[in-house]
UniProtKB/Swiss-Prot annotation:
GO CC entries: nucleus
Protein name: Gastrula zinc finger protein XlCGF67.1
Pfam families from the UniProt entry: zf-C2H2
Organism: Xenopus laevis
SMART domains in the cross-refs: ZnF_C2H2 (SM00355)
Keyword annotations of the record: DNA-binding, Metal-binding, Nucleus, Repeat, Transcription, Transcription regulation, Zinc, Zinc-finger
Molecular functions (GO terms): DNA-binding transcription factor activity, RNA polymerase II-specific; RNA polymerase II cis-regulatory region sequence-specific DNA binding; zinc ion binding
Family statement: Belongs to the krueppel C2H2-type zinc-finger protein family.
Keyword Transcription regulation appears in the UniProt entry: yes
C-alpha cells in the first residue's frame, strides 16, 4: 500500500493518521470518556458526543436522497451506499461484494467455517446469533 502509516509503540498496530493513533493509545492508558446517562465508555470525546445523541434523539445529518436522518456523518455516508449501489467490501474467496463491513465480516464465516455461537442447552453451534435464537425456541 502507498498510504503512509504510523504505528503504536506499545503494540505495533498501524494507523493512517496520528489522530487515529492518539485515540488508539487510550486503549493502553485506560483513559476514556463515559456517558453520564448509561455509563458506556468511549476512547474519544467525539464518539461520546455522537453517542449522547442516542439519548437526546438528535439526528443532525440527513440524506439528500430520501431525507432519513442520522446521529453521525459516518452513518450517513454508509447509508448513502443504498442509493449509489457502492459495495466497497469484496470477498477474496468468491468475489461477492458488500455495502457494509459488518455484513462482509459475517459472510466471511461461510468460508472459514467459523460457528462462534453455541447453544448452552445442547452445545450445537451456529454461524449467526440469529440462528441460535431461532434454535433456542426448541428447548
Amino acid at each position: 500500500s502507498d498510504r503512509k502509516t504510523v504505528s503504536c509503540p506499545e503494540c505495533g498496530k498501524c494507523f493512517t493518521s496520528r489522530t487515529y493513533l492518539n485515540v488508539h493509545k487510550k486503549v493502553h492508558t485506560g483513559q476514556t470518556y463515559s456517558c453520564s446517562e448509561c455509563g458506556k465508555s468511549f476512547l474519544s470525546r467525539s464518539h461520546l458526543n455522537t453517542h449522547l445523541r442516542t439519548h437526546t434523539g438528535e439526528k443532525p445529518y440527513s440524506c439528500s436522497e430520501c431525507g432519513k436522518c442520522f446521529t453521525s456523518s459516518a452513518i450517513l455516508i454508509t447509508h448513502k451506499r443504498i442509493h449509489t449501489g457502492e459495495r466497497p467490501f469484496s470477498c477474496q474467496e468468491c468475489g461477492k461484494s458488500f455495502s457494509y463491513r459488518s455484513v462482509f465480516m459475517e459472510h466471511q464465516k461461510i468460508h472459514t467455517g467459523e460457528k462462534p455461537f453455541s447453544c448452552s442447552d445442547c452445545g450445537k453451534c451456529f454461524r449467526y446469533r440469529s440462528h441460535l435464537k431461532v434454535h433456542s425456541r426448541i428447548h
